[in-house]
Amino acid sequence: MSELAEMMQEAAEAVRIHTHLSADVGIVLGTGLGALAGEVAAETRGPVTQIPHMARATVQSHGTELIAGKLGGKPVFVMDGRLHCYEGHKLADVVFPVRLLKALGCNMVILSNASGGLNPEFDLGDIMVIDDHINLPGLAGVNPLVGPNDDELGPRFPDMSQPYDRGLIKKAQAAAKKQKLKLRQGVYVMVTGPNLETRAEYRMLRNLGADVVGMSTVPEVIAARHLGMKVAAFSIVTDMCMPDMLEEANIEKIIATAAKAEPKLTKLVGALVASI
């Protein structure tokens, strides 16, 4: 057994002391899904700091709990809080929550984030289901899979032709239609942050084909796909990044926009889980 596999097993065993829940779905609560923690009929919950090998998030708007319970009548594990590279965490720490979910038996993971809108057809507060991504840090060699590979966990060269599960995207679209929610679909580009981008950088990212830009999610997606997990991910457009009409970023306004869209995304993800 590799060192990584041992770490995953140790973390899962620590969780199993408190719950024997069997769940196919794991959810990592990034921006826009914080309220979902309150929708879960919790069997048990506890701080991630009590779980071996789990780092702690420093972003104030993110929680630090692992919740085991039911959502929409379906058993789920919910990680309330995510880690970012810009906090100084190693990528292995950033993706470990997803690896723990796999060790607990989850075969699919749902993620969310906040993003800057690059597509001029998008509006502030829109929710986008991600159907592809551009991994700028990864193209520069920053990747959670760099290093020795454990073939029992996943292949050395995992395929990324369809990182976001088409079936889950269709279910999300169907749920949004029932809720009369305008659900965008598009490409997410990841940058490391924490600074926001320049006008020239926004222009370049749009020319590359990105619809939104953000600072998370992609490492977790790569780790999940390496483990054979299905992935669904959603992005809330919290500010518009039009290079020719760019205004100075207002973090308070960005957080407020995410909070306003949060009930819609919470309801959408709840319906998605219920349909699985």
Where in this protein do the model-derived segments appear?
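Generic non-transmembrane alpha-helical segments
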Residues: A14, H18, G167, K171-K182, ...
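Metabolite-binding pocket within alpha/beta catalytic cores that recognizes anionic/polar moieties
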Residues: M1-M160
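Zn-dependent metallopeptidase/amidohydrolase metal-coordination segment
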Residues: M215-K253
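His/Asp/Glu-rich mid-to-C-terminal helical/loop segments that flank catalytic regions of hydrolases
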Residues: C241-I276
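Glycine- and other small-residue-rich loops at beta-strand/loop junctions that grip anionic moieties
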Residues: L4, Y86, F157, S161, ...
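Polyanion-binding loop/helix "lid" in catalytic or ligand-binding cores
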Residues: E152-Y164, A176, M190-T192, Y202, ...
